[in-house]
């Protein structure tokens, strides 16, 4: 279950590598020619001015305020509560990404913690992302064997200070944010990509803008021809094997569809039809109430509502990565050149805007229950999205999309109007038939099978015998 109001294009807190020119001025190249041999050797080992080096970029949300940040991480309980024994976040699962400020007007915090996915975890939209827990506290870091052979999550702490402070070495640089970075088993079992900025799957700044949409219900698309019988009957209106009913070896003619349907509807009105669904795997045609009067059998969650900032993070500040000098003095921090100079990190809770939920729900309802079941000629393949070439496959049908403006021509002015396609296009109206829909759920993963007119299953053996 996902937040239906979440922006479909928001990324997870993530990292990526990007080539950048070094910071040295180009004029320094002339001085290198006159430098001593030792200095020249040092310069040869370091990146030359104008050369491009790969640096890590960060886009993340740090929601949890703590007491202070040291080389041990984020202190989450005050000294007064622990009588001088500081308690730091457990890197295997803290700070928990869903825990933040309890109210919108919290005072400004100076020590903030959060979690971020390493650049080695593939970027996916936050909507639909899932990573299975790997420890009893719900932490999701991938477990790696340590020197003793025990499995543990490889969580690394990354420290950040405002760029304006960290760029000047003469300042007393102090971390204001610590991000706990980890690799997770990233999956998207219930969604698929609907917009992809690039054909490559590599982590990059452009890939922050991916968008996802939910997988549609996986129904099989063929019309009912009374394959099998819903009710056991004593030969009054249908042909059956004599041994099962009247003990006479006689076969009567199969009634036409209208006679059969009338009998099914009669039984439906006087008994509990549902008990026979699984037994006989059969449908009664419910076209009129379920097609003309639309019920919801879609996910109702395909279109964005834009309740939150599109990036899912909102207002960010620019931070520079820093690192401890390693001499044990918590006051000694210096710039970390492995990170880019500008890392965008949001602090605290997200901003949110109120919208017309009823209007959005109605539009989503129409998109889920009408647009996604329209003929393929009205659909298109999203740019850069890999899709099966087989138009009868679930992958193809699931990933093709319709222009959302199409459902805006549906009219609802106190009466039941519908698009022409809703009335006369099959398999669009297949999933509106209660019995067909249920049978499709029973039969499984495929969405399309070729079919022909068939007689009830009990007659297959007789038909063969007569031949």
From Swiss-Prot:
Annotated stretches, region: Disordered: 1-54
> Which family does the entry's similarity section mention?
Belongs to the adenoviridae hexon protein family.
Subunit-structure text: Homotrimer. Interacts with the capsid vertex protein; this interaction binds the peripentonal hexons to the neighboring penton base. Interacts with the hexon-linking protein; this interaction tethers the hexons surrounding the penton to those situated in the central plate of the facet. Interacts with the hexon-interlacing protein; this interaction lashes the hexons together. Interacts with host dyneins DYNC1LI1 and DYNC1I2; this interaction might be involved in intracellular microtubule-dependent transport of incoming viral capsid.
- Where is the major localization of this protein? virion
**What is this protein identified as?**
Hexon protein
Supply any other comment: All late proteins expressed from the major late promoter are produced by alternative splicing and alternative polyadenylation of the same gene giving rise to non-overlapping ORFs. A leader sequence is present in the N-terminus of all these mRNAs and is recognized by the viral shutoff protein to provide expression although conventional translation via ribosome scanning from the cap has been shut off in the host cell.
Comp. bias regions, Acidic residues: 16-45
Q: List the top taxonomic levels of the source.
A: Viruses, Varidnaviria, Bamfordvirae, Preplasmiviricota, Tectiliviricetes
Q: Which Pfam families match?
A: Adeno_hexon (PF01065)
| The species this protein was found in | Human adenovirus C serotype 1 (HAdV-1)
- Gene3D superfamilies the record matches: Adenovirus Type 2 Hexon, domain 1, Hexon Major Viral Coat Protein, domain 2
């Amino acid at each position: 279950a996902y937040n239906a109001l979440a922006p479909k294009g928001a990324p997870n807190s993530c990292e990526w590598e990007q080539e950048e020119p070094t910071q040295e001025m180009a004029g320094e190249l002339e001085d290198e020619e006159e430098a001593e041999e030792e200095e020249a050797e040092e310069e040869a080992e370091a990146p030359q001015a104008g050369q491009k080096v790969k640096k890590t970029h960060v886009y993340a949300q740090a929601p949890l305020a703590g007491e202070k940040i040291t080389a041990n991480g984020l202190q989450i309980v005050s000294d007064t509560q622990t009588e001088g024994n500081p308690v730091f976040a457990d890197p295997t699962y803290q700070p928990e990404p869903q825990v933040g400020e309890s109210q919108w007007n919290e005072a400004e915090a100076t020590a903030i913690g959060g979690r971020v996915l390493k650049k080695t975890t593939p970027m996916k939209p936050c909507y639909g992302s899932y990573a299975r827990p790997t420890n009893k506290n719900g932490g999701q870091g991938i477990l790696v064997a340590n020197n003793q052979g025990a499995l543990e999550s490889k969580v690394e702490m990354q420290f950040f200070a405002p760029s304006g402070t960290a760029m000047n070495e003469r300042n007393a640089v102090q971390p204001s944010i610590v991000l706990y970075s980890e690799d997770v088993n990233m999956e998207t079992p219930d969604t698929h990509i609907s917009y992809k900025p690039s054909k490559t799957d590599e982590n990059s700044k452009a890939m922050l803008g991916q968008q996802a949409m939910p997988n549609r219900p996986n129904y099989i698309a063929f019309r009912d021809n009374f394959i099998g019988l819903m009710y056991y009957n004593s030969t009054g209106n249908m042909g059956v094997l004599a041994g099962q009913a009247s003990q006479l070896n006689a076969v009567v003619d199969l009634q036409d569809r209208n006679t059969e349907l009338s009998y099914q509807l009669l039984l439906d009105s006087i008994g509990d039809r549902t008990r026979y669904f699984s037994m006989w795997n059969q449908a009664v045609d419910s076209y009129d109430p379920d097609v003309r009067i639309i019920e919801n059998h879609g996910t109702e969650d395909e279109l964005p509502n834009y309740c939150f900032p599109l990036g899912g993070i909102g207002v960010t500040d620019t931070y520079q990565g820093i690192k401890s000098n390693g001499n044990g003095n918590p006051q000694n921090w210096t710039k970390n050149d492995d990170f880019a100079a500008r890392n965008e990190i949001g602090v605290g809770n997200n901003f949110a805007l109120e919208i017309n939920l009823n209007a959005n729900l109605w539009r989503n309802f129409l998109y889920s229950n009408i647009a996604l079941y329209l003929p393929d000629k009205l659909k298109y393949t999203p740019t850069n999205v890999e899709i099966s070439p087989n138009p009868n496959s679930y992958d193809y049908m699931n990933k093709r999309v319709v222009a959302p403006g199409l459902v805006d021509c549906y009219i609802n002015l106190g009466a039941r109007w519908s698009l022409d396609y809703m009335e006369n296009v099959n398999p669009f109206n297949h999933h509106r038939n209660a019995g067909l829909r249920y049978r499709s759920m029973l039969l499984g993963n495929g969405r399309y099978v070729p079919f022909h007119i068939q007689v009830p299953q009990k007659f297959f053996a007789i038909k063969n015998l007569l031949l």
